[in-house]
């Protein structure tokens, strides 16, 4: 179904919630209105925009670092320095280990998630219209953080780092004891401890990914509802106030993802 064939608000909303997918068995684009009953599909729009925004972050920050001056900085350099100072201060307050990786990781997470969230402020029909009429794409979603696959993948990366730092700082034996001898320090309670600590450990990446996804999906859906249910000449009455409020949500969700990552890695680096 193309944008020109959409005749009802329900069809409009459904159209904008479809991802551009590729079937990994045939390497062909998936018809969003007749999807195959298979797990082997890939949301290539989410991957494309997340990679492009990640590269944009690297290019912009490298350019600032390359042309940084000790004199009066420009506006963009000042903004970058404020972000770096803010993230560095957050890491110093919350992480008590000695790893030099945490501050760059926190900066990358904050800016990358912020840029992905920021895509939600683009006009709903702009890039999907270009994708359909210029490139012939059957669907296109432009907010990577509104895709649960992206947010859980990022959370999985954080989870791997949690395991890495837990084993690095405590050793395999210390990490095993943490899972089996807490909170009840007696061998008879090892099965119960393992269940409790296992659930606690696994809940960290799940809650981290789902929190970001849920907030950004809801924000995207509200923009789609406004565009799909109201006539074009009255949409700005709700779009503008919601966009202003959504800027706070965008920034807050990037900050929360960064903070929880720092806290989880700090917990992994410390003894209970």
UniProtKB/Swiss-Prot annotation:
Instruction: Describe its function.
Output: Key component of the proton channel; it plays a direct role in the translocation of protons across the membrane.
Q: Chief location of this protein?
A: membrane
Starting at the broadest rank, the lineage of the source organism is: Bacteria, Pseudomonadati, Pseudomonadota, Gammaproteobacteria, Enterobacterales
A single BP term in Gene Ontology: proton motive force-driven plasma membrane ATP synthesis
On the tree of life, the source organism's domain of life is: Bacteria
Supply the Pfam families for this chain.
Answer: ATP-synt_A
**GO molecular function of the protein, one example?**
proton-transporting ATP synthase activity, rotational mechanism
InterPro entries in the cross-refs:
ATP_syn_F0_a_bact/chloroplast (IPR045082), ATP_synth_F0_asu (IPR000568), ATP_synth_F0_asu_AS (IPR023011), F0_ATP_A_sf (IPR035908)
Per the record, membrane topology reads: Multi-pass membrane protein
- GO cellular-component term (any): plasma membrane
The protein's name is ATP synthase subunit a
Q: How does it assemble?
A: F-type ATPases have 2 components, CF(1) - the catalytic core - and CF(0) - the membrane proton channel. CF(1) has five subunits: alpha(3), beta(3), gamma(1), delta(1), epsilon(1). CF(0) has three main subunits: a(1), b(2) and c(9-12). The alpha and beta chains form an alternating ring which encloses part of the gamma chain. CF(1) is attached to CF(0) by a central stalk formed by the gamma and epsilon chains, while a peripheral stalk is formed by the delta and b chains.
- Keyword set for this entry? ATP synthesis, Cell inner membrane, Cell membrane, CF(0), Hydrogen ion transport, Ion transport, Membrane, Transmembrane, Transmembrane helix, Transport
TM helices/strands, residue ranges: 41-61, 101-121, 147-167, 212-232, 243-263
Where is the protein localized? Answer: Cell inner membrane
The family this protein is said to belong to: Belongs to the ATPase A chain family.
The answer, when asked if Ubl conjugation is one of the entry's keywords, is no
